[in-house]
Amino acid sequence: MGKQLRQMKIKEILHNHDVGNQNDLIRLLDKAGIEVAQATLSRDCTELGIIRSRTHQGFRLVLPEDSPGQIIRGLVGMEVQSISSNETAIVIKTLPGRAHGVASFLDQLKDIAILGTIAGDDTVLVIPLSIKDIASIIHDIQSNLSQT
């Protein structure tokens, strides 16, 4: 099966099922007759902007169009514990295991002032294009993660 058809099926599954993680998604794809490797599914999820967010029912894989952007911002924002910086970079502390989702969300914003992000388990390192823009980038990050 081609990439486009596989990604369409992924979207369909996420719209019709509460999927908690990529392993659950692999099982549902397998039931639909689609075999996919974990690495391929991970790339598909990144390309589709899928994030794993906490809901009242536990964790769930969420497509960006599943909810208005403000809800996704709020979900990702709830995972951020602090934002700090020094003279060269920005560090975002998250709940354990949530840094990748926050970094993915920031990458999806395609902010030209952000050169890139690196995620660990509970820490995101944000590298600015210019150190002169650090205060502005922090403000933009806080605005984009706002729940209001």
Curated annotation (Swiss-Prot):
Its main location: cytoplasm. GO terms for cellular component: cytoplasm. It comes from the Bacteria. It is found in: Cytoplasm. Transmembrane segments: none annotated. SUPFAM superfamilies: C-terminal domain of arginine repressor, Winged helix' DNA-binding domain. It holds the Pfam family Arg_repressor. Gene3D superfamilies: 3.30.1360.40, Winged helix-like DNA-binding domain superfamily/Winged helix DNA-binding domain (1.10.10.10). Keywords: Amino-acid biosynthesis, Arginine biosynthesis, Cytoplasm, DNA-binding, Repressor, Transcription, Transcription regulation. InterPro entries: Arg_repress (IPR001669), Arg_repress_C (IPR020899), Arg_repress_C_sf (IPR036251), Arg_repress_DNA-bd (IPR020900), WH-like_DNA-bd_sf (IPR036388), WH_DNA-bd_sf (IPR036390). The keyword Transmembrane does not apply. Pathway: Amino-acid biosynthesis; L-arginine biosynthesis [regulation]. GO terms for biological process: L-arginine biosynthetic process; protein complex oligomerization; regulation of arginine biosynthetic process. The keyword NAD does not apply. One of its GO terms (molecular function) is DNA-binding transcription factor activity. HAMAP family: Arg_repressor (MF_00173). Belongs to the ArgR family. Regulates arginine biosynthesis genes. This is Arginine repressor. It comes from Prosthecochloris aestuarii (strain DSM 271 / SK 413). The gene is argR.
